[in-house]
């Protein structure tokens, strides 16, 4: 995935930031959001 500069404690927190970044499937890895490009 693509790491974005958004801190997180759970993957659910990455859904919106990833959508806002034009991507999908947010996952929280090492307290940072990682997104899957469309």
Swiss-Prot record:
Chain positions found as Lysine amide: 38
Main location as per UniProt: secreted
Location relative to the cell: Secreted
Superkingdom of the organism of origin: Eukaryota
Cysteine pairings via disulfide bonds: 8-28, 14-33, 18-35
Note: Negative results: has no effect on Kv1.1/KCNA1.
Domain notes for this protein: Has the structural arrangement of an alpha-helix connected to antiparallel beta-sheets by disulfide bonds (CS-alpha/beta).
Name recorded for this polypeptide: Potassium channel toxin alpha-KTx 3.12
Provenance organism: Androctonus amoreuxi
């Amino acid at each position: 995935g693509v790491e974005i500069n958004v801190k997180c404690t759970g993957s659910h927190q990455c859904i919106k930031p990833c959508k806002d970044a034009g991507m999908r499937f947010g996952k929280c890895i090492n307290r940072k959001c990682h997104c899957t490009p469309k």
